[in-house]
């Protein structure tokens, strides 16, 4: 092989190795926290768990939890805002260590990832406008248009319930719940399916506009997602969460953002509509 060709191949291989490292977090250890930083992927449009305030700063229950978690672990936290429909691909690509973004624990997700013990009780509800006939059950959605956030458990539930309940309605899918609630207020859609924590936040924000009109339809508590191989790291996170639960920090954050404590005695018997 000519020397010129060897040099060219060496350069090409060097570029390939450089590009492989771009966009991923790497450390000299298998411990994701070896660099002293906990990186967290989050969808910053999911009020009140993670969103931007008037100063464009990240705020919300999960944001406060992430800070407390990092402090408990003795590291710094770095947020990586990510679109929800690509957030798990980013985790597998090692663009961050965890997904901390209001993620429901489901059997399907547990086949591809590890998830911590739940830190927040959660289930799906139907939201109606105050000036309309309330949809108390999926059957009441017949002939209506329902808004959901794309690729969420509410999205899957809205599609599955059409078959399970033998009812026909249209599902409009939004990139952010903020857009779905704006569409509901503007009468572009008739109802919303979403997590109860999100629904209660919006109904508290605008009690004359929105109302939670159904019972909780599912049980899908929220946890932190890590890569399947990071079993020891997952247990490390569980230990930190236990400490925050025992010292009252989780309760404090829950009262701040939800006005009630939804972090204790969480039902872990999954009931996911899919």
Give a label for each model feature.
Residues 29-31, 129-146:
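Flexible hinge/capping segments at coil-to-helix
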Residues 23-25, 63-72, 132, 139, ...:
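Extended ligand-binding regions for polar small-molecule ligands
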Residues 27-102, 236:
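Extracytoplasmic small-molecule ligand-binding "clamshell" domains
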Residues 18-21:
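C-terminal motif of bacterial Sec signal peptides marking the signal peptidase cleavage site
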Residues 86-89, 103-112, 157-160, 183-186, ...:
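A ligand-binding cleft/hinge motif common to bilobed small-molecule-binding domains
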Residues 44, 121-128, 196, 200-239, ...:
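Periplasmic-binding protein-like
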């Amino acid at each position: 092989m000519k020397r010129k060709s060897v040099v060219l191949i060496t350069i090409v291989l060097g570029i390939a190795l450089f590009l492989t490292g771009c966009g991923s977090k790497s450390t000299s250890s298998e411990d994701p926290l070896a660099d002293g930083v906990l990186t967290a992927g989050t969808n910053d449009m999911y009020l009140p768990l993670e969103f931007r305030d008037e100063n464009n700063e990240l705020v919300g229950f999960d944001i406060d939890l992430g800070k407390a978690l990092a402090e408990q672990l003795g590291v710094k936290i770095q947020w990586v805002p990510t679109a929800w429909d690509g957030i798990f691909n980013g985790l597998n690509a090692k663009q961050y260590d965890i997904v901390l973004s209001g993620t429901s624990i489901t059997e399907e997700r547990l086949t591809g990832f590890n998830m911590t013990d739940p830190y927040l009780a959660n289930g799906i509800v139907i939201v109606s406008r105050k000036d309309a006939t309330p949809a108390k059950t999926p059957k009441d959605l017949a002939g209506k248009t329902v808004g959901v956030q794309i690729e969420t458990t509410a999205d899957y539930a809205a599609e599955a319930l059409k078959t399970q309940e033998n009812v026909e309605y249209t599902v409009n899918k939004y990139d952010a719940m903020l857009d779905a609630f704006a569409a509901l207020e503007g009468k572009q859609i008739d109802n919303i399916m979403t997590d109860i924590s999100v629904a209660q936040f919006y109904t508290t924000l605008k009690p004359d506009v929105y109302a939670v009109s159904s019972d909780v339809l599912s049980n899908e508590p929220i946890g932190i997602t890590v890569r399947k191989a990071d079993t020891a790291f997952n247990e490390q996170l569980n230990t930190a969460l236990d400490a925050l639960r025992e010292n009252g920090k989780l309760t404090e954050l829950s009262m701040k953002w939800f006005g009630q404590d939804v972090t204790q005695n969480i039902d872990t018997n999954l009931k996911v509509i899919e």
